[in-house]
């Protein structure tokens, strides 16, 4: 099915919800990782529609650990979207972590701020991977929740805060200027115009450190901009 054996292995790991059986991702070169990702996304596109894009490694610390000075990008497909308030099983993921993000809805009339929760996942054992590994491994995607678009001009909002709770207990809180999220669209300037879609959802990077996802009722409260929730079951 795939030209590259790594693509076949990652596809199988995703389908079977397991870690890869190959050597560490350090053996992957960037050009090969990009080619693997192209193969995998082409296969996903045959069964699920493109709905948006994600930006990964948006903070300086993660970029430094990956040896890069810019985020990586990855397409989001419809099978990765879950509805606000839905239940989701841990059996769907290998090593999931939760992130709360400023999402964007980019359309012909402008840009809307959108609350976003991303469940990141990794098919390399112990999350030990390099930048090429992250790119090849579906951009570390697990699932996404996007809320309703926030009314008003994003330029008029100076800060968005989020508090993440599990079963009513605060796990983390964070904040960011949405102007920084909008500015990151420059890394998607080609992608947002090449596929003919009139609207895209964009996950722009986490406001918090990734939290290991356990069973329970999770809420990401973005204050006046609304909240997102999900029930995680075993």
Spans of features found by a protein language model:
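Catalytic-core "active-site belt" of small-molecule-metabolizing enzymes
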Residues: 2-193, 214-215, 219, 225-234
